[in-house]
């Protein structure tokens, strides 16, 4: 009788452990269902973003990158300062078996009266060509534009590697005033990049 009771208790214990293990596995599965592509940091340089002149912020989940510039200002009435550029290098941590591509980029800035400005941006990975976007603005205007890269080109990094996104942006100005990318009001202007990813084929 004692041995039968022990056997019954053992069976119940095993069943309980199996149920507990199933619950743990079920609750843990979503955490591994969607691997994340994570933005690590950003490096920058150029006449429009000399060292120490930009503020770089990465969101807590690593999905968004924001840059705020202090000196990305082209002067239309100064030939030496009429074009400013900024080259960005953004290391991205890519999960094994996935590729990364650009999704979109938002730009905000200002063009003063009697000024024509041209914003040009190229997006690529090292050793690859990517799409180029150009826009012309006539001052006075506060602009807020988006380069919707997903609708134009799929620029994918190599499978299973951490990659450096590269963005070469330039602002040119003609006329009496200035054209900026993120100037003065940091709460409303800046540059934000988003990303998308897919499984390797």
Question: What are the residue ranges of the model-derived segments?
Answer:
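N-terminal secretory signal peptides that target proteins for export/translocation
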Residues: 1-12
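N-terminal leader/pro-regions and domain N-caps
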Residues: 32-76
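Short, solvent-exposed beta-strand/turn "edge" segments of beta-rich domains on protein surfaces
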Residues: 75-83, 91-100
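A short beta-strand element within beta-rich, extracytoplasmic domains
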Residues: 99-112
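Short, surface-exposed beta-strand/strand-loop-strand elements in extracellular ectodomains
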Residues: 115-128
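Short, surface-exposed tryptophan/glycine-enriched loops
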Residues: 133-163
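Internal, hydrophobic beta-strand segments that form the core of beta-sheet-rich folds
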Residues: 159-176
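Proprotein-processing/basic-patch segments
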Residues: 173-201
């Amino acid at each position: 009788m004692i041995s039968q009771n022990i056997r019954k208790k053992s069976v119940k214990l095993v069943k309980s452990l199996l149920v507990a293990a199933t619950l743990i596995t079920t609750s843990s599965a979503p955490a591994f269902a969607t691997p994340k592509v994570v933005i690590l940091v950003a490096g920058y340089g150029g006449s429009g973003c000399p060292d120490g002149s930009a503020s770089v912020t990465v969101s807590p989940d690593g999905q968004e990158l924001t840059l705020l510039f202090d000196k990305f200002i082209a002067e239309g009435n100064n030939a030496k300062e009429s074009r400013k550029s900024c080259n960005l290098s953004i290391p991205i941590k890519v999960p094994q078996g996935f590729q990364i591509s650009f999704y979109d980029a938002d730009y905000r800035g200002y063009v003063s009266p009697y000024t024509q400005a041209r914003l040009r941006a190229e997006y690529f990975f090292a050793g690859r060509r990517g799409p180029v976007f150009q826009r012309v603005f006539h001052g006075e205007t506060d602009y807020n534009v988006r380069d919707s890269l997903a609708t134009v080109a799929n620029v994918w990094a190599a499978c299973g590697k951490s990659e450096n996104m590269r963005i070469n942006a330039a602002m040119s100005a003609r006329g009496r005033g200035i054209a900026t990318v993120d100037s003065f009001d940091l709460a409303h202007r800046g540059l934000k990049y988003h990303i998308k990813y897919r499984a390797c084929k």
